[in-house]
Amino acid sequence: MSTAEDITQERVVDIMRDERFVMLSTATADGKVVSHPMTPQEVTDGANVWFLLGLQGDQADAIRVNPHVNLAFAETGSWLSVSGVAEFVEDRSKVAELWDGQLDEYFTGPDDPNLGLLKFVGQSAQYWGVPGGGMVAAVKIMASKVTGSEPPGQMGTVEL
């Protein structure tokens, strides 16, 4: 696998914007790493991500204790891991702006007192990818084993 020269902040942001779901990993007070599926409400050009979440619960408690978190994005043939810091933001107008009717299942509306606004500030990202994704990637990897050539794909790290 070669080092990717074209893994830039812009590319990271594009990948983040393309994914509907992400795993948000936190560390609990006793040191356990726990991941939760989340839906990014907005991804900024600066690699910051806005989420809406419940203010009462294990996930919010873990972030209050240790705001250093990780976001994991995956699609067929590529993976992105972004580390950063999460912070709770008091901004009801931003909550209303980001409100999605699909959240009705979890909250009574954008004014629900348990509904919180979380801003993730990305600091560093790691990317692994194989062109063509899924089956094409598997064939290319097997071919590299048979021929002894370098496996296809790229990896890279970028500070955000």
Identify the function of each model-found stretch.
Residues Q41-G77:
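A short mixed-secondary-structure module that forms the rim of ligand-binding clefts
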Residues N48, H68, W79, V85, ...:
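Structural motif
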Residues D14-D30, V69-F73:
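A short, Trp-centered hydrophobic/proline-enriched beta-strand micro-motif
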Residues M38-Q41, A86-E87:
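Hydrophobic/aromatic beta-strand elements that line small-molecule binding cavities or substrate pockets
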Residues M1-A4, V85-L160:
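Charged, gly/pro-rich active-site loop segments
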Residues A27-A29, G54-Q56, A74-T76, S83-E87:
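Histidine- and/or cysteine-centered catalytic micro-motif in compact active-site loops
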Residues M1-R20, T157:
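N-terminal leader/targeting segments and the immediate start of mature chains
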Residues G31-P37:
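A positional/architectural concept
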